[in-house]
Each structure stands twice: as structure tokens, then as C-alpha cells.
């Protein structure tokens, strides 16, 4: 599968023939080859060179029950560690990932990352699918030799998580069409939207670090060529996006190219050189020149090339369509839903749960509105913030002590959003890099977008949200896999739950009706957006139908105002689903535990949840029951 983009949380949260642009051979190939397949009006025609599922696989097909193996005790643990190490080396195989994820990658066995091919491979060509599938089948078979019942503690949790993920990978690599359903260069969330910011994250402790960084810059040429080739191959197979989407992608590269002469990375590079102890003036001068040369003669020319290649694809005559309009799209969505939501629930089960949650919110909002109006004054004047990001972090760190478990001693530092990103970046974000060092935590701050509810944003990103969870997980397991390969649905579900929970700390009166109404407001937009995401990909909702649905639920949007987000949801399936359903399933686990264990305190429930690590929500709930009983 392709690495859609490297998430700035950096715990997430991924050699083909290069096609020349010297002529029009690429476009001729795209337009000349007919897209075979079903032409009954039900599906968009796509190539029969690819393989497609003939049905939607059930959970039991992907995750069948297994008999216990024969390896017990220390032999079982050794086998688990062996498989984990093998998978980590397979997943973290490039310099960029290794350098960002770990301060000392060699200590976790990552020694094969070459800075000359720093970004690794952007995609997995269909021809490599059998090899990938065989790799994961071998790891599964090795795991199944373990007698699961003899494992204890985080070994048992790691076994559950790794086996689940391995079986998902086996299914994922069973059908080559799965590689091509989605666009890489999405204009809103594609890798080009954050590449400059990501480059600013690299730190230099030694001369070699700076020299390797320049190799990272030079490798952008090869890496982005791979992604362009992917888009061209995707169009060749009949999955071309709309001319509007390709133009929007090209425009993002145009915007990058405008920074060629005064990009913030020039100054940032020089400032990072200041951190290298004993750097000679001659080496400093050389590195500055090499950095500028790589930026102006490799990076920005590559972005110009990408813009040209995306505009060329406009002639392929594609369209933006939901997954339900493609052969095998329903099976792909089912797999994607499990992966992104961190749950084994089906798409239908997820939609049913989501619709019920939306109905419940609607009823609760109506009931609150009919109550005494005293709370409305608090709601209208609320200010859920203590000031700056530091003031909010200091306040929350103390306020949450009675409800959330301790995390290890650690440090964090603040990083201002570069001015070029201020208009589009959220008020704050957590960046956990060098996950083998508790002191490597960054809170990225965008002072331009700070609002009166900044405190709950800080709760989402810091305490008790992303930073708190990351620190706790890393300090409560010896299995690196559990914090490197955690699902986005798990992480965002926890952080959004914490965002809502933390409103009570700012109200001055604890959990009030006004606080609850603010929580409903928070949930409302997220869950409706999630429902639209499902509607597009399961029921083929058009732009008009999405706008109609949102307006029927009081959102007051127009076709023109929603068009950009509609395109995002069509071209990036499950974009909102991973956030919305991650939150729904997290809250569902918490509510179930409070119902089943009414004497348990929130501290006990939150601790049991975090102690269950980054397993699926079903696995987490099972483990919590054993802990809380």
C-alpha cells in the first residue's frame, strides 16, 4: 500500500521506472489503453489487469480463530519479540522515518536506513503485492506457533495487536486494485501540503546530521517522481481523478514554488547549524551553500515538475467518485474502516452506531434548551482557556491529577508555526518524535488562530490528550510496536475524548449544563462530517445530497462553501471517519465501563484504558473488564 503522507505526529501519524516528461508518451499510454471491466453502468470502468475482491470479507474471514501453538514461556516471548523486530525493520526501512521516530534507531534494530534514498518507496507497485503478502503470511505463521495463554501482561496485548495488524496486511495485499482507489496528491492533505514543515523538524547534533539532511533534500526528486508515476499509473488503470482535482494539486505545487527565493527553511537551516558543537566556519559555509543548491536546483524544480505532470493528467478525463462507484470499492472501504477506526465493527454497524449517536445528541440538545435558562449565560460567555499554551499546560498538568494516571518525568518545548502556514494551521498540534526519549515532545503553536477555547485545544494536544497518552504508553510497554504502529482512530479518539472531558476543568463549576452543551457542539460537527464521509462512499452521496443532509441538521452550508471539503472526502476516504468513529468508539468503551462498574472512579477507568495500550477498541474493552472486575 502507498504511504499517503507522513503524519506530523511522526508515530504514524508511511524502485519503479521513472517516466520522462520529455515527450507525451505517458499521456498517450494513459489515453490509448482501454479500461476493461464491467460496463453495466454500475461501476466506473477500471482495468482487468488488476485483481479485485468478489465480495466483502467478513471479520471472521480476515481474523479467523486459531488453535494455540506449542511455544510456551520464554520461548513464546522470544518468538513474539523476533516477529515484532522483523516487522519494525520492514515498516521503518527509510532514513526519514528512522531519524524522526528514534533518537537512537540502532537500539531498536533499525540499522538499514540509507540517507541516499532517505524517503524510501512512496508506493508498493501491484507487482510487489505477492511478495508483501508472503512476508506477512510468514510472520502470522510464526506468531501462531505461540501458545497465547502462556503470555502475560503487555506481551499478551502486543500479541493481540500485532496478530490483528498482520492479518489485516495479508488481506490488504490480496488484491492489487486496493493500491489505486485513492489519490496521493490530495490538494488539502497530500504530502506536498506539509513537506516543508516536515523538513523543519529535522534536528542537527552532528556534522553528519546536517550532511544527511542535504541528502534528504536531494532524494525528494526521486521520491516525488515515484508519486507522480503512481498518479499516472492510477489514471492508466481507470482510476483517474477529476481535472479539477489535478489542477488543485498542481496549484499546491505552484504555491510551494513561490517560496523558492525566500523559503523559511534557508534561515531555519542556519539556525539548526548553530546547535552543532565545534562546527568549523568552513564546514558551516559549505553546508549553507549545499543546502541552498539542493533547495533551488533539486527541491523546487521537482515541485515544478510535479505541477506539470498533474496538469497533464487533466487530459485523462477522470472523475472524483466515492468508493461505492468502483468495482471492489465496498470491500476496500470495509478494510479501510477497520484500519482507520481501530475497530472490527463493519461499515454498516459503524453507520448504525453513528446515526444513533447523532439522534441522541439531537434529543439531548433539545432537552437542554427546554431547561432553565440559567446555564445559557455561562454558555454564551464561557472562556475555556488560561491564556498562553504554557499557562494552559501548567494548569492542566495539575488539574487532571485526580482523574488521569501519572506519566514519567519529561520535557517539552514549543515551536512556532512558520508564518507561511499560519492561515491554514490549527491553533496547536503535538509532535512526538524520537519516541525513545521522553524529553522529545513538541507543542507546535499557531498564535494567529488562538481563540477563547484554546485551553481545550491544549488538552487535546497536551494533557491529558496526545502528549499524555504517548508518554504513558511508551512508559508502560517494552514493545516498540505498540506506540509506533498505533491506529489514528485510537489516538484521535482518546485526544477528542480528553478535549471534551477537560472542559469541566475550565468552567469553574465542574460538569455543568453549559459544559455539556459545549461538548454537544463539539461532537455535532465532527459526527455529521463523519456521516457525510460514509454517505459519499457507501451510498454515493453527491455534493447536493451532502449539503442537504448538513442543512437538515442545522449546519447552514452552501454548495460553494462545502465544495472544497466534499472533494477532500471523495478523494481521501475515511478522512473524517478515523476521527469521528475513533471518538465514538472511545466514548462507547468509557460509557460501557462506567455502566458495568459503577463504583469505579474515572481515575481507575482511565488507567485501565491506557493500560490496555493501543489495541483495538474491542480488545481494550475486554482487557478493561478483567482489570476492573
Regions found by a protein language model. Give the residues of each.
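C-terminal motif of bacterial Sec signal peptides marking the signal peptidase cleavage site
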Residues: 20-23
Amino acid at each position: 500500500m502507498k504511504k499517503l503522507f507522513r503524519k506530523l505526529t511522526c508515530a504514524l501519524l508511511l524502485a519503479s521506472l521513472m517516466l520522462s516528461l520529455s515527450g507525451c508518451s505517458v499521456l498517450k499510454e494513459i489515453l490509448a489503453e482501454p479500461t476493461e471491466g464491467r460496463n453495466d453502468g454500475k461501476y466506473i470502468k477500471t482495468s482487468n489487469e488488476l485483481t479485485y475482491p468478489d465480495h466483502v470479507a467478513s471479520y471472521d474471514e480476515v481474523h479467523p480463530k486459531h488453535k494455540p501453538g506449542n511455544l510456551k514461556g520464554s520461548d513464546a516471548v522470544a518468538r513474539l519479540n523476533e516477529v515484532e523486530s522483523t516487522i519494525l525493520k520492514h515498516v521503518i526501512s527509510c532514513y526519514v522515518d528512522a531519524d524522526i521516530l528514534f533518537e537512537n534507531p540502532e537500539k531498536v534494530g533499525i540499522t538499514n536506513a540509507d540517507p541516499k534514498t532517505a524517503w524510501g518507496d512512496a508506493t508498493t507497485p501491484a507487482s510487489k503485492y505477492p511478495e508483501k503478502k508472503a512476508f506477512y503470511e510468514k510472520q502470522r505463521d510464526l506468531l501462531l506457533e505461540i501458545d497465547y495463554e502462556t503470555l502475560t501482561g503487555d506481551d499478551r496485548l502486543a500479541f493481540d495487536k500485532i496478530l490483528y495488524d498482520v492479518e489485516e496486511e495479508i488481506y490488504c495485499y490480496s488484491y492489487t486494485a486496493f493500491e489505486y482507489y485513492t489519490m496521493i496528491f490530495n490538494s488539502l492533505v497530500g504530502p506536498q501540503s506539509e513537506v516543508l514543515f516536515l523538513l523543519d523538524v529535522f534536528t542537527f547534533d552532528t556534522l553528519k546530521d546536517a550532511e544527511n539532511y542535504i541528502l534528504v533534500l536531494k532524494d525528494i526528486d526521486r521520491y516525488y517522481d515515484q508519486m507522480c508515476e503512481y498518479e499516472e499509473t492510477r489514471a492508466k488503470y481507470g482510476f483517474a481523478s477529476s481535472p479539477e482535482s489535478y489542477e488543485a494539486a498542481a496549484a499546491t505545487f505552484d504555491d510551494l514554488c513561490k517560496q523558492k527565493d525566500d523559503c523559511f527553511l534557508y534561515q531555519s537551516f542556519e539556525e539548526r547549524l548553530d546547535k552543532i558543537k565545534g562546527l568549523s566556519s568552513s564546514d558551516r559555509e559549505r553546508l549553507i551553500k549545499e543546502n541552498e543548491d539542493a533547495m533551488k536546483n533539486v527541491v523546487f524544480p521537482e515541485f515544478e515538475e510535479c505541477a506539470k505532470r498533474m496538469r497533464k493528467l487533466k487530459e485523462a478525463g477522470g472523475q472524483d467518485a466515492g468508493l461505492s462507484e468502483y468495482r471492489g470499492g465496498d470491500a476496500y472501504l470495509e478494510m479501510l474502516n477497520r484500519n482507520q477506526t481501530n475497530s472490527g465493527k463493519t461499515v454498516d454497524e459503524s453507520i448504525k452506531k453513528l446515526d444513533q449517536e447523532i439522534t441522541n445528541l439531537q434529543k439531548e440538545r433539545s432537552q437542554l434548551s427546554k431547561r432553565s435558562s440559567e446555564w445559557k449565560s455561562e454558555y454564551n460567555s464561557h472562556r475555556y482557556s488560561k491564556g498562553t499554551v504554557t499557562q494552559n499546560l501548567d494548569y492542566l498538568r495539575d488539574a487532571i491529577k485526580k482523574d488521569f494516571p501519572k506519566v514519567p518525568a519529561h520535557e517539552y518545548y514549543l515551536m512556532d508555526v512558520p508564518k507561511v502556514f499560519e492561515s491554514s494551521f490549527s491553533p496547536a498540534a503535538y509532535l512526538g518524535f524520537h519516541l525513545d526519549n521522553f524529553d522529545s515532545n513538541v507543542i507546535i503553536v499557531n498564535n494567529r488562530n488562538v481563540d477563547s477555547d484554546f485551553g481545550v485545544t491544549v488538552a487535546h494536544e497536551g494533557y491529558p490528550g496526545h502528549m499524555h497518552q504517548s508518554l504513558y504508553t511508551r512508559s508502560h510497554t517494552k514493545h516498540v510496536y505498540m506506540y509506533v504502529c498505533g491506529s489514528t482512530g485510537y489516538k484521535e479518539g482518546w485526544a477528542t475524548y480528553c478535549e471534551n472531558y477537560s472542559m469541566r476543568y475550565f468552567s469553574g463549576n465542574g460538569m455543568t449544563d453549559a459544559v455539556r452543551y459545549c461538548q454537544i457542539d463539539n461532537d455535532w460537527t465532527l459526527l455529521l462530517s463523519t456521516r457525510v464521509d460514509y454517505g459519499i462512499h457507501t451510498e454515493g452521496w453527491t455534493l447536493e445530497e451532502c449539503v442537504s443532509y448538513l442543512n437538515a441538521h442545522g449546519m447552514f452550508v452552501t454548495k460553494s462553501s462545502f465544495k472544497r471539503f466534499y472533494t477532500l472526502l471523495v478523494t481521501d476516504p475515511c478522512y473524517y471517519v478515523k476521527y469521528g468513529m475513533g471518538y465514538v468508539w472511545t466514548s462507547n468503551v468509557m460509557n460501557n465501563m462506567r455502566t458495568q462498574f459503577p463504583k469505579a472512579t474515572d481515575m481507575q477507568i482511565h488507567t485501565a484504558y491506557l493500560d490496555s495500550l493501543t489495541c483495538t477498541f474491542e480488545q481494550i474493552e475486554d482487557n478493561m473488564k478483567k482489570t476492573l472486575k
